[in-house]
Amino acid sequence: VNETNSCFASLLTPQGKYLFDFLIIKHKNGYFLDCEKLQIDNLFNQLDLYKLRSKVEILNLSNEFVVAALSNEKFLEFEGAKNLPGFTIKYREDHIFLDPRKKELGARIIVNLEKLYLSLKKLDLSASNIDEYYELSHEIGIAQKNTDQLKNKIFGIECNFEELNGIDFKKGCYIGQENTARIKLKNKLSKRLLPIKLIEGEIKDEIIKYKDHEIGKVLIKNKFPFASIKYL
């Protein structure tokens, strides 16, 4: 992670199961962590727990900054922008970066809340329905809403983190590495987190069956549902 490259990362349990995921962006002498709004307090507390006595200051700046999304095409209009996942530029004081998970998600911009409307005007951006963004994310297969429902229920590698540039198998030790590496190296990946859509009705049962065989389990039941689906 540096001034021109942001990344996708996660926190796992010692067993390699999902806890949190977030984006990391270089900011002055520190870093921004961009995560789901509902997970801010829990992530802050978890990081504060890991800090121990290290000389690291962790701040919750969610009341000072806001994140907005823009299209890949709009991002590439900016001077110096490159069509590379995670590529980051700075427009005045605002960080703009192409989503490191999938370019199809477009770019994100971190804006000081007090200057939000001024920044959007100078960037020639206009507000749109936020559900359009989450619908796109759901179609691509990236869970960004109600991710607390995944905690301790699914391995990070089953969340497609390798495909989303969120796992580096050349990296040194990290919490959850042993099981993550074992699943990868021994080809033990037997299920994945996938988006599901209802033809009609509503989700009443967690279990998903195909021809009387259990093939998966619904983990996120809300507006943009996801399930852990087994390979057949």
Question: What is each PLM-predicted segment?
Answer:
Residues V1-D21, I25-K28:
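Acidic, proline/glycine-enriched N-terminal capping motif
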Residues V1-E3, L70-F75, K197-I203:
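Short, surface-exposed ligand-recognition loops at beta-strand->loop->(often short) alpha-helix junctions
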Residues N2-N5, N83-K90, G201-I207:
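Glycine-centered loop/turn motifs
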Residues F8, D21, G86, G106, ...:
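Short, acidic/polar N-cap/turn motifs at the starts of alpha helices
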Residues Q15, K26-K28, K51, L189, ...:
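A generic beta-sheet turn/junction motif
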Residues Y18, I157-I167, Q177, A181-L232:
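Glycine-rich, small/acidic residue-mixed loop/short-helix segments
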Residues L23-I140, Y210:
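Acidic, low-complexity central loop/insert segments
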Residues K102, A107-L193:
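Anionic-ligand-binding alpha/beta catalytic cores of soluble enzymes and soluble regulatory domains
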